Amino acid sequence: MKLDILAFGAHPDDVELGCSGTIAKEVSLGKKVGIIDLTRGELGTRGSVEIRDQEAALAAEILGISVRENLNMRDGFFVNDEAHQLEIIKRIRKYQPEIVICNAIEDRHIDHGKGSKLVSDACFLSGLRKIETEHEGVQQEVWRPKVVYHYIQWKNIEPDFVVDISEFMDIKTKSILAYASQFYSENSNEPITPIATKNFVQSIHYRTQDFGRLIGVDYAEGFTTERYVAVKSLGDLI
């Protein structure tokens, strides 16, 4: 299956928190979008691997994406080496996305920066013909995405561009709340974590509101790029 956009997250819920409004918008425009989670979040303080698997499946259904995979890398301990790069390369060649979106370049959680660099490096390597990979016994064609973008997570990073998600904020919120084990609930006996504080989900709204304010819309998501953003004409900019 060829995808238009492939989004990566170090953990289940990274993509939802960072760019699910943009994903929902692209799906509504007829684009085929997939999500690949690097780990199952097994080191997370709250919930369990099994619960998070179920939550990820529910979030995927809410977003209407075409495919979701988990690479089962070690939470907290995966590294940017040949073995891990090859796992990413195989998926890039399998789905042949034009656009790849991945974790923030740097962030509070060490896996976010690591995952970002791992995916970015794999996107480049995936275009090298002398790196040979197979899928279901068939040699894969080389493929390099046209662009790699990074969503913004815990740290307040200055975006290179923002996407208007005003009509999709409700879907973004629903996809985030699909991960009920990870966020604040009065009925939960689980420990409080940085993302399980009472106001965390509200802070996501505030950020999207602020990005939206800067471009004159209700809600927006910010991204950073690895190269200049090109437009065909000034009319493409709003």
Q: Can you annotate each of these PLM segments?
A:
Residues 1-95, 224, 235-236:
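Active-site rim/loop-helix segments in enzyme catalytic domains that contact anionic ligands
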Residues 2-6, 82-238:
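Metal-dependent de-N-acetylase/amidase catalytic core
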